Amino acid sequence: MKVLLLEDVKNLGKAGEVCEVKDGYGNNFLIANKKAKLATNEVINKYKAEVKKKAEKEALEKAQKLQMVETLQTITLTIHKKVGANGSLFGAITKEEITERLKEQHASLDLDKKDIELKHPIKSTGIYEIEVKLGFGVVGAFKIDVVAE
C-alpha cells in the first residue's frame, strides 16, 4: 500500500513523501494515528496545493516584514519622561511602553512587545538603538530618543 506521510516518521520518511508500506502498518498505525493518508492522485495533488499555498503565504508575510523593517529604519521615536536630579528617569522604559508609543506615533506599524529585543530597561536620557526581530529571519532596528520633560 502506498501512503503519503503527513509528518516525519522514524525509519520510514519525511512529511510529504510517498512510501510503500505493508497494509497492516499503513491502516492500523499510520492512517489511524493521522501520520499518513492513503496515497491517491487526489490526495497527493491536494497536499501539493496546500504546501504551495503555505509557501506563497509565508513569502507574502516575509515581504511585509521586510517592508516594515525599511519603514522602521527611518523612524526616530521620541519619548518624554520625568527625570531626577542625577539625570536618571523616574521609572524605566520597557518593551511595553515602546510598543505603546510606537502605535501612538506611527499607527501603521503593528509591532508586538515580543518582537522588540531589549536587553534591559532604559533608565536614562539619550538616543538608543532598539533591535527588532520580526520572524522569518527578518531583523531591523530603529532609534529612540529619550528626553526630559
UniProtKB/Swiss-Prot annotation:
Lineage: Bacteria, Pseudomonadati, Campylobacterota, Epsilonproteobacteria, Campylobacterales
UniProt cross-references to SUPFAM superfamilies, sorted A to Z: L9 N-domain-like, Ribosomal protein L9 C-domain
GO biological process, one term: translation
Record carries keyword Ribonucleoprotein: yes
GO cellular component: ribonucleoprotein complex; ribosome
NCBIfam families linked: L9 (TIGR00158)
Organism name: Helicobacter pylori (strain Shi470)
SS bonds (residue pairs): none
Function, in words: Binds to the 23S rRNA.
Keywords: Ribonucleoprotein, Ribosomal protein, RNA-binding, rRNA-binding
Record carries keyword Membrane: no
GO molecular function, one term: structural constituent of ribosome
Protein name: Large ribosomal subunit protein bL9
Residues that span the membrane, as ranges: none
Protein family according to the UniProt entry: Belongs to the bacterial ribosomal protein bL9 family.
